[in-house]
Amino acid sequence: PCPGLDQSTVTVTVVNPPDPGTNGAVSVCSNGAALSLFAQLGGAPQAGGTWSGPSAVVGGMFTPGTMSAGNYTYSLPAAAPCPAVSSTVAVTVNQPPDPGSSGAVTMCSTGAAIDLIAQLGGTPDAGGTWSGPSAVVGGMIDPATMSAGVYTYTVAGTAPCPDQTATV
């Protein structure tokens, strides 16, 4: 070294920022099982954050029957000099279809046609399909032209809710 030249040392430390993963989305059925919100995040999220959203989150779990749909935010605190970060899971809650409850009817072979949906209990969703021993047209059964037997009313579910059925 040159005489009279001073030296200084600078230490550079690089800190990796916290990783909350990437945003996610999930659809659940309102009568479905609880699920982990953390598992819905993409990437490799770092554990140890906190959840916030339209409903209180306990243990990182979303329970469809008791929690509201909406955006749930996973937040990790700052790791100086890196700022706090967060990712969001958008939760959609779908209602299961309601085909009503099964019913029964006894008809005279010379009787008038009847509306099958009126034979179901409860409040069946409209728009379902009928199947049975004879083709059902307009939801009506005509004892003079159709076969006796079990007729099934099927209402399609919105994923992940499965289709539901009731019978007459």
Regions found by a protein language model. Give the residues of each.
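Proline- and Ser/Thr-rich low-complexity, intrinsically disordered segments
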Residues: 1-168
